[in-house]
Every structure is written in structure tokens, then in C-alpha cells.
A protein has these predicted regions:
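S-adenosyl-L-methionine
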Residues: 1-63, 67-68
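Conserved hydrophobic residues forming the short capping helix/wall of the S-adenosyl-L-methionine
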Residues: 38, 90, 94
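Conserved SAM-binding motif I beta-strand of class I
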Residues: 72-77
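Conserved SAM/SAH-binding beta-strand->alpha-helix loop
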Residues: 79-81
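Conserved SAM-binding loop
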Residues: 86-87
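Conserved H-loop
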Residues: 95-96, 107, 145
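Conserved SAM/SAH-binding loop
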Residues: 103-109
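S-adenosylmethionine
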Residues: 113-175
Length: 185
């Protein structure tokens, strides 16, 4: 079956992305809405942006940022098949110089990647909401002030962030996907 997931804007617009077998990628329409929100005053300086796609899976968020912005993306995932797919997708667009790919548990490498990342995307497995919460809480203790966090959750299983650490900029639901866009206080 051919992937319907594609890069939606920027220099690689229209390119299809390979998917790992177990992926649950954010649908194109939801990603379009997400980037419209980000580009409506949340992200202002995209020059030399560092993006961390923490539970990368299909890598669609990080690759979209590479395509749209002058960005370097860090991709982390524990699944070997996801890492192999990320490498394949990055090679297909010849973006190796804009990508760092690490097979690791995202929570375990927060100290390594949180500082310096301007934009962090977390889309932990939908059936494990507590993993997403644990990541966001630990990231809140480490990330630089002003860091933007996009937290995707299952809409019927969404949990709230710690508002002592994060300011809620947007809170939107698109089908099963619930997006919280947060800024580190």
C-alpha cells in the first residue's frame, strides 16, 4: 500500500514519506492545521531553528520543519523500524546535513537534547498517555525558557500540562488528534 503521508509545504513539498509498519502518523489535514497555528505568530524566527521530534515514528513533523524552515532536526525513537524509516526518508530528500537520528528513549535523552531546541514535538503512543505526561514534565525542568512544545495526544485521553512550567498558547482537536502548543515559562 502506498503511503498517503507527504510533505505538505516548503522545498520538499509533495514528496511522499515512507512509513514504519507500526506507525500512527498525524494525518496531513491535522498537520496542515498544526503548522498554520505555529505560523500564525507562535514561530517567528525560523533561521537556524533546532527541532526535536522526540517520539519520531514516521518523522513527518521533523521533516516538515526541514522542508519549511532553515532547520536542523533531531529525531529520536526507540523502535529500530522507525529509525530505519527515518534514515530512508532523510536520504530520499538528501537532508543528512540537517538531521541527527538517534535510537533512544526520548525521556532518557532529555538532558542531551532539550537545551538548545527551539521547537519540540512529542507524540507519544496514544495508549500510553502517562509517557507523554512524564516527558513533558521532565522537559519542563530542563528546556530553555521560550521553548515551544507541540504535544499531540489522543483527543479522548488528553492530559493537561503543568501550567507552572508551561504557558498554553493553543489547545485544538482535529479528529483523534488533540494538539497543545505550549511555551516554556
Amino acid at each position: 500500500m502506498e503511503s498517503k503521508l507527504q510533505i505538505i509545504s516548503g522545498k520538499y513539498r509533495g514528496r511522499k514519506l515512507a512509513l514504519p509498519p507500526s506507525a500512527r502518523p498525524t494525518q496531513n489535514r491535522a498537520r496542515i492545521a498544526l503548522f498554520n497555528m505555529l505560523e500564525s505568530g507562535i514561530i517567528e524566527n525560523t533561521d537556524k531553528m533546532v527541532v526535536w521530534d522526540a517520539f519520531a515514528g514516521s518523522d513527518a513533523f521533523g521533516i516538515e520543519c526541514i522542508s519549511r524552515y532553515n532547520a536542523t532536526a533531531i529525531f529520536t525513537d526507540v523502535a529500530p523500524e522507525s529509525i530505519a524509516t527515518i534514515r530512508k526518508n532523510i536520504a530520499a530528500i538528501s537532508a543528512e546535513n540537517n538531521a541527527k537520528i538517534v535510537q533512544a528513549d526520548a525521556i532518557g535523552v532529555i538532558q542531551q537534547f532539550a537545551r538548545g531546541a527551539n521547537l519540540v514535538f512529542v507524540d507519544a503512543p496514544y495508549d500510553t498517555a502517562e509517557i507523554g505526561r512524564a516527558f513533558v514534565n521532565k522537559l519542563g525542568r530542563t528546556a530553555d525558557s521560550g521553548t515551544i512544545l507541540v504535544w499531540e495526544q489522543e483527543s479522548n485521553n488528553a492530559v493537561e500540562p503543568n501550567t507552572d512550567t508551561w504557558e498554553v498558547l493553543r489547545d485544538k482537536t482535529y479528529g483523534r488528534a488533540h494538539f497543545l502548543i505550549l511555551q516554556k515559562i
